[in-house]
């Protein structure tokens, strides 16, 4: 909760003002039963006391209106403060999530991060809001009601106070049980979010393979697990309210019995007992409010801890200041090995270098480590062994901003936002119109000019109103528009026809010849003109050289060429 308190601290003045208004309204509420007692015992029984009844009754109405207005104003202020605190918390949480390394995202899972950004922040919002509304009001009504009751009728008040230890024990028990239970529920919600996310992403494949029923059953299992968790948590917490109500009603009945006896014996008047019972009702309602506060605190505290776990996560990809070495090569991998799970290597002993302005082609079967190599170059992960250098600088010595400013990237499975083509290409960067048009031309994306509005044509979610090849060309435009010094293309032309692919590669050589280009591809034709080609299999480089060299000394490359190009490969 310490981190969440840092977000609340700037609003202390507004919270204090709201609490002062709440205190004023609560104090007024505490006067009302005493005024009722005066009306019944003093004015109603006195001859000619009608004027006093009307006067005191009018004062009660005025006080009730003032208390209502004060509570309305305070509640509005608490809602505004809670909304602003949650907005700041959600903003910083989103920024921290986007700054997490790939390894940290893998550890926390996307589903859990989405859940923390949505339902957990909502729970924290409710906790802050309820604590402002009831955190002062409930204790004041409880303590104030007990004090006034003690002054008014000590015997009956002591009867009521005798039940408080039972209530306190119930509240403490619910608080201790609640936090771990609701943390467990949120973990179940993470699983459900992950299942929904998988089904939304793979909806077309699921329908195409007629696996809809199977996925519905799988979702049903996850949903049933979440329902079971919620049921256990809700049933545990649901015991609190009935138990509290039983204790309160039992104490109220006992107070009424004792009070009736004291009225019958003439120790107190009817007005005083009615007023006292009003205070008892106030005290009991305040106790119920306290119970609700603890239930809400249990939910909010569990969510706050999950949010703090993300906000307090330190960068695991730190930059280290090092002396720059003079090196002619632009990109160097020196005996690099890496493992995702730290048990077996996904890539082993990667060793190569490529000069400024040259093209590196990477080819190999699925799962050979091609995309992992790019992830290491982009420093989504740090290598376990070996060293990666860019322009003579170890990758760890470059800040994220410095590294990413050099890169232009098109991933194998990239995304387009539901926005205009212009904004998808700009992607928040300050890019001039001329640079965007040049990128459109180079990426062979002339179809954009044929769309209604050109660059201002609106895309659907994930660009689904474009064909696969058109989507890839818009993504290539995005990478080229920033004029990168290193261009990483991860199988980004797989949906292009051979003619468009050939024109794209020719335009890249002519217009971006100064950039070092790394091409990951399944097609031999996409890499055969590269200055250096890496042939990868099972995480290792099994062939390295130019196209003619590999045709002579790499059987796998030669076989790929013969399968894809036929006689043209020889």
Language-model segments: residues:
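An intracellular "coupling" helix at the cytosolic face of ABC transporter transmembrane type-1 domains
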Residues: 9-13, 78, 99-103, 119-132, ...
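Helix-loop junctions and hydrophobic alpha-helical segments within the transmembrane domains
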Residues: 93, 97, 206, 307, ...
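Helix-loop-helix
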Residues: 47-49, 58, 148-162, 235-305, ...
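Hydrophobic alpha-helical transmembrane segments of ABC transporter permease domains
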Residues: 20, 24, 28-32, 70, ...
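Juxtamembrane helix-loop junctions of ABC transporter transmembrane domains
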Residues: 20-21, 25-41, 63-110, 114, ...
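Transmembrane helix-loop-helix hairpins at lipid-water interfaces of multipass membrane proteins
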Residues: 9, 15-73, 150-155, 266-270
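ABC-type nucleotide-binding domain
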Residues: 326-570
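ABC transporter TMD-NBD coupling linker
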Residues: 201, 280-342, 382-385, 389, ...
């Amino acid at each position: 909760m310490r981190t969440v308190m840092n977000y609340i601290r700037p609003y202390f003045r507004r919270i204090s003002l709201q609490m002062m208004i709440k205190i004023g309204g609560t104090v007024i509420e505490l006067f009302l039963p005493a005024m009722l007692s005066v009306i019944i015992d003093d004015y109603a029984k006195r001859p000619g006391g009608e004027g006093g009844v009307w006067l005191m009754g009018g004062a009660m109405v005025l006080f009730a209106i003032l208390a209502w207005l004060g509570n309305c104003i305070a509640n509005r202020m608490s809602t505004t403060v809670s909304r602003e605190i949650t907005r700041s918390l959600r903003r910083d949480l989103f920024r921290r999530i986007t700054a997490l390394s790939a390894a940290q995202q893998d550890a926390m899972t996307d589903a859990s991060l989405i859940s923390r950004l949505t339902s957990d922040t909502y729970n924290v919002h409710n906790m802050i809001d309820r604590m402002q509304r009831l955190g002062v009001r409930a204790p004041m009504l409880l303590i104030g009601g007990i004090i006034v009751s003690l002054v008014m009728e000590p015997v009956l008040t002591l009867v009521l106070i005798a039940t408080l230890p039972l209530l306190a024990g119930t509240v403490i028990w619910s608080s201790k049980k609640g936090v771990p239970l609701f943390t467990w529920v949120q973990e179940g919600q993470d699983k459900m979010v992950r299942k929904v996310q998988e089904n939304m992403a793979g909806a077309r494949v699921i329908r195409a393979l007629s696996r809809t029923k199977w996925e519905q059953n799988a979702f049903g299992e996850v949903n049933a697990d979440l329902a079971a968790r919620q049921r256990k948590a809700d049933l545990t917490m649901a015991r609190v309210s009935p138990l509290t109500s039983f204790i309160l009603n039992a104490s109220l009945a006992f107070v009424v019995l004792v009070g009736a006896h004291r009225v019958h014996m003439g120790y107190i008047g009817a007005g005083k007992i009615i007023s006292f019972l009003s205070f008892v009702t106030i005290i009991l309602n305040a106790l119920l409010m306290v119970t609700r506060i603890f239930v809400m605190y249990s939910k909010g505290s569990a969510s706050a801890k999950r949010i703090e776990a993300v906000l307090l996560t330190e960068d695991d990809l730190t930059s280290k200041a090092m002396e720059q070495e003079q090196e002619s090569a632009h990109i160097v991998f020196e005996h690099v090995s890496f493992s995702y799970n730290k048990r077996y290597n996904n890539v082993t002993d990667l060793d190569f270098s490529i000069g400024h302005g040259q093209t590196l082609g990477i080819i190999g079967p699925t799962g050979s480590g091609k995309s992992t190599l790019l992830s290491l170059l982009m420093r989504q992960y740090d290598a376990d062994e070996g060293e990666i250098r860019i322009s003579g600088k170890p990758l760890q010595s470059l800040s994220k901003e410095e590294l990413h400013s050099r890169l232009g990237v098109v991933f194998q499975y990239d995304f387009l936002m539901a926005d205009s083509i212009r904004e998808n290409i700009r992607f928040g960067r300050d890019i001039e119109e001329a640079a965007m048009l040049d990128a459109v031309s180079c990426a062979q994306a002339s179809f954009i000019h044929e769309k209604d509005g050109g660059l201002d044509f609106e895309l659907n979610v994930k660009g689904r109103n474009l064909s696969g090849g058109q989507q890839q060309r818009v993504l290539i435009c995005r990478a080229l528009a920033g004029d990168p010094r290193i261009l990483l293309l991860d199988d980004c032309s797989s949906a292009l026809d051979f003619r468009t692919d050939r024109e794209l590669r020719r335009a890249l050589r002519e217009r971006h010849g100064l950039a070092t280009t790394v091409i990951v591809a399944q097609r031999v034709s996409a890499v055969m003109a590269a200055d250096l080609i890496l042939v990868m299999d099972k995480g290792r480089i099994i062939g390295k050289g130019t196209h003619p060299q590999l045709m002579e000394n790499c059987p796998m490359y030669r076989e790929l060429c013969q399968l894809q190009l036929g006689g043209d490969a020889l």
